[in-house]
Curated annotation (Swiss-Prot):
<protein>
    <recommendedName>
        <fullName>Deoxyguanosinetriphosphate triphosphohydrolase-like protein</fullName>
    </recommendedName>
</protein>
<dbReference type="InterPro" id="IPR023023">
    <property type="entry name" value="dNTPase_2"/>
</dbReference>
<dbReference type="InterPro" id="IPR006674">
    <property type="entry name" value="HD_domain"/>
</dbReference>
<comment type="similarity">
    <text>Belongs to the dGTPase family. Type 2 subfamily.</text>
</comment>
<dbReference type="InterPro" id="IPR050135">
    <property type="entry name" value="dGTPase-like"/>
</dbReference>
<dbReference type="InterPro" id="IPR003607">
    <property type="entry name" value="HD/PDEase_dom"/>
</dbReference>
<dbReference type="Pfam" id="PF01966">
    <property type="entry name" value="HD"/>
</dbReference>
<keyword id="KW-0378">Hydrolase</keyword>
<feature type="domain" description="HD">
    <location>
        <begin position="62"/>
        <end position="198"/>
    </location>
</feature>
<dbReference type="InterPro" id="IPR006261">
    <property type="entry name" value="dGTPase"/>
</dbReference>
<dbReference type="GO" id="GO:0008832">
    <property type="term" value="F:dGTPase activity"/>
</dbReference>
<dbReference type="Pfam" id="PF13286">
    <property type="entry name" value="HD_assoc"/>
</dbReference>
<dbReference type="InterPro" id="IPR026875">
    <property type="entry name" value="PHydrolase_assoc_dom"/>
</dbReference>
<dbReference type="GO" id="GO:0006203">
    <property type="term" value="P:dGTP catabolic process"/>
</dbReference>
Length: 378
């Protein structure tokens, strides 16, 4: 049984295009299934976080990251009496809008799109699930429920100021109440993203040799976990020691989020989901001490992993690829596949063409972007 402040399936605001209710699945189970079966979700397999795909099969991809986020989201949501299906749905959708080459790709496309309304991966995820997926006879997109769209749009909290055009377009058609907090389920998905990032970037950085366990021993939380493992399992082989310590770090983060939320919910006693949306600030978050410790870990990762010389070289290389492909397609849309060429021709002006090119390039996998750059740029 879910808590009164959880999103209730029977109270869903529904879909943009009304559909008959399923006999066997809740609205958010259907949303989840549509996301899993989408083309954009499958492409996440060949989109990377930090390391370009061809560098190794071990490193996380957007797909493995997304699965990890969904697992964490279900765990936290279940512990708090929230709707686990909605939390999982938002988690599964949260990275659909990421372009090839991780954050490097996003930075490159944001710069290229600056004259044409900008680029934001959360807004692009909304565009994918409302426009670009074309599997159904009666509508474009996946026709997700309002609650799922809200969770995607507010992944980083309430949205104020100038809106990315993709988000403004959707919000103009269906008010997502961008000025309010997201549901508790969507907040859980956002925090689960942070948990998964912090955990697996430590794993991947160690695997890549960008830092050592001795380096991690100097960090808050991680150092304590390593010391605890050494006390309980002296002489443990290095691989097991590493995994055991990072497993404990993972547990610390999840348990902290649950404890903080339980205390805040007990104190504030919200009676429905709207009270969650109208609160001052999020109800799902890390404690202040852990938040500060995680900032130190993120700074370490930024300096030793994201700005590692080998990663910086790769960032430059893939940025050059996108800086070559985007203007090439913008100047000559016929170099894109026929359907994309036709869409660009029908767009009317340069801004419209640029947005079509963005949709095409942002949808590429790392592998395909590299192949296209080799084919078209030499």
């Amino acid at each position: 049984m879910t808590a009164p402040y959880a999103c209730q399936p029977e109270e869903s605001r529904g879909r943009r295009w009304p559909e008959r209710m399923s006999t066997f699945r809740s609205p958010w189970q259907r949303d989840r299934d549509r996301i899993i079966h989408s083309s954009a979700f499958r492409r996440l397999k060949h989109k990377t976080q930090v390391f370009v795909e061809h560098e190794g099969d071990y490193y996380r991809t957007r797909l493995t990251h997304t699965i990890e986020v969904a697992q964490v989201a279900r765990t936290i949501a279940g512990a708090l009496g929230l709707n686990t299906d909605l939390a999982e749905t938002v988690a599964l959708a949260h990275d659909l809008g990421h372009p090839p080459f991780g954050h490097t790709g996003e930075d490159a496309l944001a710069a290229l799109m600056a004259p044409y309304g900008g680029f934001d991966h959360n807004a692009q995820a909304l565009r994918i699930v409302t426009r670009l997926e074309r599997h159904y006879a009666d509508f474009d997109g996946l026709n997700l429920t309002w609650e799922s769209l809200e969770g995607i749009a507010k992944h980083n909290g309430p949205v104020t100021g100038d809106l990315p055009y993709a988000l403004a377009e959707v919000n103009a058609e269906w008010d997502l109440e961008l000025h309010t907090n997201a549901s508790a389920e969507a907040q859980v998905a956002a925090v689960a993203d942070d948990v998964a990032y912090n955990h697996h970037d430590l794993h991947d950085g160690l695997r890549a040799g960008l830092f050592t366990e001795a380096d991690l021993a100097e960090l808050p939380v991680v150092g304590e976990a390593l010391a605890r493992v050494d006390a309980l399992h002296p002489g443990l082989e290095p691989m097991r020691r590493r995994h055991e310590a990072l497993r404990r770090v993972f547990g610390v983060m999840v348990e902290d989020v649950i404890a903080v939320a339980q205390n805040r919910l007990a104190s504030l006693q919200p009676q429905n989901v709207q009270e969650i949306r109208d609160m001052e600030g999020p109800i799902i978050r890390f404690s202040k001490p852990l938040y500060q410790n995680l900032k130190a870990i993120k700074l370490f990762l930024f300096q030793r992993m994201y700005r590692a010389p080998s990663v910086v070289v790769e960032r430059r290389r893939v940025t050059e690829m996108l800086n070559g492909l985007f203007p090439l397609f913008l100047d000559d849309p016929s170099k894109m596949p026929r359907t994309w060429f036709q869409a660009a021709e029908a767009a009317g002006d340069e801004t419209g063409r640029a947005r079509v090119v963005l949709d095409y390039v942002a949808g590429m996998t790392d592998r395909f972007a590299i192949q296209e750059a080799q084919r078209l740029l030499g």
